[in-house]
Amino acid sequence: MSIEVKNLLKEYGEQKAVNNISFKVAKGEIVGFLGPNGAGKSTTMKIITGYLHQTAGEAWVCGINVAENPLETKKKIGYLPELNALYYDMYVREYLGFIADVHQVEQPKEKIGSVIELTGLKSESKKKIGQLSKGYKQRVGLAAALLHDPEVLILDEPTSGLDPNQIVEIREVIKKQGQEKTVLFSSHILQEVEAICDRVIIINKGELVADDKLSNLQKGQKDNHVVLVQFRETVAKGVLENIKGVSGVEEQQTKSYKLQTKDPDLVKKQLLEIALQQNLDIVSLQTESQSLESIFKELTNK
């Protein structure tokens, strides 16, 4: 396994920032690491990268124990922290040259040119980092993480500060890197995780609450289907709440409703019966699986 953590615990006095979590990430996997603010995501990432020592438990990167061999594990990792520390007085190419020296990168000019092209920094490469927008500063951090061609990428909020077009570009970079490397990344933009990852790990209050393929999580939640219905006429919300098998009703807009259920076929059948009995016109009726956002809310609002 490229990343493995076992019974990881990090305490600050009586507070358990990370509480006995275990998971593995294999080569070629892109795994989304999710949790609300303060859940322990960044703490876990800092332990895996060797920037923070755990209270108990163990972490390995490419089979190397992080606590016992922090320098060797850092050579295997490309790390983009949430707070991307950069030298603002250095030029982009100058900074990447410094990072190349730190990692003793062979053929540094070629590698620097390659990551600049890959991360879309070419037009900004002759500027000082302090002159760049937040989005381009984020790209510099990602370029630095990729420069020494690491086996493992750990990215904490990699699309923070990017505009929609830039997000799509960086998403493609991450997906491409994930074909050959191990990628663990956190994001508050759940749509990004859905677009990039097949598997997600969710932690809440320092504890692991989910670790599975996204498709399995969508199937496994007890109320994992949504029926979307739009009427031509106004319908009382209470009528829909009384439908057998409906666990929740949310009014989306005028005459449109979202119904939570684990039996969408039964609910749709009853909606058609109600429409027939009350002489109502249904404009649209469709089923969708539970989104990552709703799964996340259900698992972290406990």
Question: Where are the language model's segments positioned?
Answer:
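C-terminal coupling/interaction segments
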Residues: K262-K302
